[in-house]
Each structure stands twice: as structure tokens, then as C-alpha cells.
Amino acid sequence: MPNLRALCQAYLDGEADPDQVEEAFREARGCTKCDTGGVDHLRAIEVCRAQRTVEWKKKRRSMVTASECAAVLGQNKYDTPQKILMRKLGMTVFKGNKFTQHGQDMEAAAIARYEVETGHTVETFGLMVSPDEPWLGGSPDGITQCGRVVEVKCPVTREIVPGEIPRQYMAQVQQLMHITGLEVADFVEMKGPEEFQIVEVKRDPDWWNTHEKKLREFHARLTECLEDPTLAPKPRRRKKKKPDFDFG
């Protein structure tokens, strides 16, 4: 069996590709905690199986998704409700950057390492919607077979603070638990072989009641603009481009 930490470092040094890292972790995985089929019932609220496909993007357009939640609530200093609205209306396009690409490349390896270290088996899901609020969606990075939401971030430059979750990601995790009805999530961060942590997050029973009004108001505004494009916000003059932010 290859040295897993060394393999992660080799990837960071450009000497190993993501598929090679993922395969090594998959081979090392040993499921000791999960029962097969434990989350099959959640397939009923999965409206699109594959993430980042044309269908996935189309369905997300009319929803408030978990990754957008913090911005809609004003809890993400790097994004705003106005920017989210304009992207959904097709007025602006976020094409990704080196940080988001790195996060996507390392996600599978981070999940595989999570499986090795916890003994859980992670199932992949696509776009899921709330049974009670079908306009509320989310695409978890995974769900363990024993019912834990798994959300992964692989920052490039951002510091990983032991035991802490960046504020802009807490709303994302809470919305995923609200949608799925699950009571616990694991927030996983990996920044190379030496920096890896898992922070357990419990579902906050007051979260939805606290934020429902603002989320509904944003969705109503989005629906209004989708139905009548003349109501869409006017684009502002473009300012000088700022450096990319590390969304990992």
C-alpha cells in the first residue's frame, strides 16, 4: 500500500494526479461503521443524480441552493444576494478559478481519506430538494450510509483553524441538514497530507425558523425576475477586477 500522506504531497507538488490519489485511498478504505443501503430513502428527494451537468445547472437556476445560502443571508463577505441573483438570471457568469478547480480536483481524495479515518462509507448524491420547500436545494459532497452529511473544502491558501468552520460555510451545512432531515454533518477540510480535520456539526433546530423569511423573500424575487426579465436588476459598471478569492 502506498504512503497516503506522501501521495497527497506528491499531488500538491504536481507529481500525482487526482485519480491516482483517489484510487490509493479507495484501496485503503475499510468500512467498519456503516450498513449498506442506510440512506436509500434519500434518493426520493434527489432530482438530479450527477453534479455539474447541464441538467443540474438548469434545475438549480430556480432554487436557493445550499452553496448560495450564506450569500443570500448576508453571511458571506465574498458574495452578495445581488450577485447571486444576477448569476441565476444569466446576467453574469462565474467560470471558476484556480481555487475552485483545486477544490474539485481534491474532493474525492479528501472523501476517501475521511472514509479511512472514520470507518464510514460515503454515498454520492446529486441535487436534492426539501420535501416541504421544493425551491430549496443542495448538492452534498456526500452522505454516509449511517446518515451523516459530508461537506468538503480543500483550501489552497486559507488557513485551517482547528475545530472551526468559516462562517460562510455554516449556513451551507445547516441547509443541507434541513433538506435531508439528517441531524449531524461532518465538515471536512484538507490542505495537504499534514493538514486535515473533521469538525462535527449538529443540526440547529432554530436555524430554519430564523432564516426562512429572508430565504423565501429572495426566492420570490428570483421567481419574479425569471418570469418577467424586465424586473431584473440593472447591471452595474464593471470595476477593476480584484484578485481571485480562495473559495476552498
Language model features: what each stretch is:
Residues 1-105, 233-248:
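Charged, glycine-rich intrinsically disordered N-terminal tails and low-complexity linkers that flank
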